[in-house]
Every structure is written in C-alpha cells, then in structure tokens.
Amino acid sequence: MASPDLLFNLRNLFYLGAYQAAINNSDVPGLDADAAAERDAIVFRSYVALGSYQLVISEIDSSAATSLQAVKLLALYLSGDKESAIVSLKEWLSDSAVGSNPVLRLIAGIIFMHEQDYTEALKHTHSGGTLDLHALNVQIFIKMHRSDYAEKQLKIMQQIDEDHTLTQLANAWLDIAVGGSKIREAYLIFQDFAEKYPMTGMVLNGKAVCCMHMGSFDEAETLLLEALNKDAKDPETLANLIVCNLHLGKPSSRYLSQLKLSHPDHVLVKRAVSAEDNFERALQAVA
C-alpha cells in the first residue's frame, strides 16, 4: 500500500495561492529528508510569492540544498537584481552535478518566462519530469499563442494524475486561452476549487476572468472586489479590475495608479504609459 502523501495539503495551498496559509501549515511531522527539502522549497516559494524577497535571500545560505538555492535566485531576480541572478542561474544550469535538478529547471523556466525569452525557458522545462514543469510548459505555450502544444502538455499531465490540482489549473488556463464554449468549463473548475478549498485571490481572479469572457461584468466586479479585500496590491486583481471597470463604464484610474506604484513593470502599466506618451506626442504635433 502506498504511503500517505504528507505534503498533499501544503502543495494545494501553494498551487491555489494561499501562500500565508501554506507557511502557517508547513510544520508537517514525519517527513523524510526529500519531503522536508520539498516542504522548505514550498515555504520559501510562498514567501517569494508574498514579496518577502529579502527574507528568502537572507535565510538561504550557500550550504542549502540546490532546490533552495534556486528559490533564492528567483527572490534575487524579483527583488531587482536581475543580471546577477541570471548569471548565477546559467552557471548552476551548466553544472552537470546540479543542472538537472527539477526545481532549478522550474525556476529557470519562471525567470526566462519573466524575461519573455520563451525559447530559453523551454530549453530547461520542455523535457518535463514533474507536474510542476509540465504546468509551466502549458503557461509558456499559452504565452506563445501555441495552444496546440499546451494541449499536448496537458494530456501528459492528465495521464500522470487527472485529478491533481495542477492538472485542473492547467486545464482551466488552457480553456480560457482557447475561449468560446471552453470558458464555461474553466469557470466550473474554479468553482470546484472554491467549494473544496479556502477561497483565494487566485481562484477569485480565475472565476472573474471567466465571467468577463462570458459578459458577466457585474459578477466579475463582485469577485474582484472580494479578491482586493484579501490583497490590495495583487497585480492580477488590479489589472482585472481596470479591464472590468472599463467595460462597466466606471472609472479605473485609481486601480491603474495603484498598479503603477506597486508593479511598474506590469504589462498593463507599460501599455498605459505608452498610450499616454503617444497622446502627448499627438498633442504636441497639433500644437
């Protein structure tokens, strides 16, 4: 008989965006060395997701496991030390002793996806090996507008574990990317998460995006305001509220100002700044 998966609940909390809950519930007894290392990686990735980059950088020293060193590189990268993080990352990846570590490959994929260097990201993630890597492949292929390749990755995940939270999440992401009648299926996946697990900003945003695709902007706004109450600085919540309010004919400048302050590199901020610059140039040309 298979031994129980002691990290099942912890992983689910992390995957669904309940990062503080994952940290609070990380004291799991009876873990062997490998499971303890995975637990530590989840905890530090949760701190990264909450923006506590310096805590991660200071607490993971040079003697830590490869998986934790990888998470530290992600914290360095997101804290603004991008060039140094990428140089170190490439050194680690070229080291035959640790370069194949699945967490290191996952972090490489995440960092290069942030860089919008999807070819480089896939170089490290395409061979898969874990559900996390396959799920990241789905995200990368969606970013590349290759839903056909994303679907192949999803099918591999479904063969491994169709009911796994990551498989269901990847299914929802792909359904939203494909659109049309698939949006309803994505909505039902997020609804299922909402019924089974504590409601998180990620699940609320997922439901809200589906609602917007289906034209239910009032329901989407209600969900997004609930998400905003959970985290007033979450970039996806703010970005989705901007889009939702534009469709509802409501002012969205306050949310855009918040997004500019907390996440100046967000794609929506860059588009808004570019539009403002173009408008200024047009005014000057007329003047």
From Swiss-Prot:
InterPro entries xrefs? Coatomer_esu, TPR-like_helical_dom_sf
* Single GO molecular function: structural molecule activity
Give coiled-coil spans as residue ranges: none
Q: Which GO terms describe its cellular component?
A: COPI vesicle coat; Golgi membrane
* SUPFAM superfamilies reported for this sequence: TPR-like
For the keyword Membrane, the answer is yes
Subcellular location field = Cytoplasm; Golgi apparatus membrane; Cytoplasmic vesicle, COPI-coated vesicle membrane
Keyword GTP-binding among record annotations: no
Alphabetical UniProt keywords: Cytoplasm, Cytoplasmic vesicle, ER-Golgi transport, Golgi apparatus, Membrane, Protein transport, Transport
Give the membrane topology, semicolon-separated if more than one: Peripheral membrane protein
Q: Which GO terms describe its biological process?
A: endoplasmic reticulum to Golgi vesicle-mediated transport; intra-Golgi vesicle-mediated transport; protein transport; retrograde vesicle-mediated transport, Golgi to endoplasmic reticulum
Q: What is its main location?
A: cytoplasm
By sequence similarity, the record places it as follows: Belongs to the COPE family.
Summary of the function given for this chain in its UniProt record? The coatomer is a cytosolic protein complex that binds to dilysine motifs and reversibly associates with Golgi non-clathrin-coated vesicles, which further mediate biosynthetic protein transport from the ER, via the Golgi up to the trans Golgi network. The coatomer complex is required for budding from Golgi membranes, and is essential for the retrograde Golgi-to-ER transport of dilysine-tagged proteins.
Q: How does it assemble?
A: Oligomeric complex that consists of at least the alpha, beta, beta', gamma, delta, epsilon and zeta subunits.
Tell me the protein's name: Coatomer subunit epsilon-1
